[in-house]
Amino acid sequence: MGRPLIRIAGGLLLGILVAAGGLAGAEELKVGYSAITANQVPLWITKEAGFFEKNRLEVTLVFIEGGSKTTQALLAGDVPIVQVGGSSVVQSRLAGSEAVIIAGAFNTLNFKLVTVPEITEPRQLKGKIVGTSRFGSSNDFAARFMLEHFGLAPDKDVPIIQIGSEPARFAALKGGSIHATLVEVPTTLQARKLGFNIIADLGELGLEYQHTAIATTQGVIQTRPEAVRRFMKAYVEGIHYYKTRKAESMAVIAKYLKMNDMEAVEEAYNEIGVKRTPRKPYPTLKGVQLILSEIADVNPKARGTKPETFVDARFVKELDDSGAIDRLYR
């Protein structure tokens, strides 16, 4: 048996042992998640490695496609906790719900700027065409943010057009109808293999955005505080496992994303697990404010609402203040 398989088997054994020690008296808890993307990995790893059972929770993960449907299931009581896009929670709360963000799973946008081979730095984009998925999307927002960061005026210095999906944008790059676009990890690996350049990483430009969050309701916090507390303890333990057990974590990524290309799996692990997943998963108030600013034109309620309205970080703060998170990394 090769070393990677030994490490993976060891990790699975750890999960079994952890689970065996924690099942007695475990509380049942359904947890929803809204997408099959690399940003969702911490939840899957926490489940697969047995940390919910260690913390006396018998968790069933439920995939509910799309942020709005997942948030609706949360509000209906079908799933008391969800991992979902932050914007879905914000819009739901603005509409009068009691949904609240209790942790930040991914606090920026997972986009990199990909260009045709002859463009090697952002200033060369002046007068060129950038393709986005659709106007008003997070992809479009990220493209405009990047251009402004590099001193280029979107639409004026750099025309922006709608193209559609990532495959469509790659085809447009290859065909020369656009000169740049934004793609997510691990599609960045494919971009490099096709000979395109990656000249900027949004996550390294300091942008805070509540891309993916752990959310519940105020009612659940009031009626099941210990379940939420144990969930959060398991979750930060899962993040630690994610960051420190590469082979086992890659196996979970490959399983849930149904990926056979281990080079792409490693790209996702390094770029998201190691670089972008926070050890201390506090929600980002700046990131929530950015969501509010983004939707203010279509929802005037967003203008006068403070980001603190949407966040309750007490459970992460308890763990942080107790030193429990820091001890994991010693």
Regions found by a protein language model. Give the residues of each.
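N-terminal secretory signal peptides that target proteins for export/translocation
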Residues: M1-I6
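Bacterial N-terminal signal peptides
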Residues: A9-G21
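Sec/Tat signal peptide C-region and signal peptidase I cleavage site
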Residues: G22-A26
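Short, glycine-/small- and polar/acidic-enriched structural segments
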Residues: E27-G175, H179-V185, I198-E208
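Short linear loop/turn motifs
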Residues: T60-L61, V158-I161, E267-G273, K306-K317
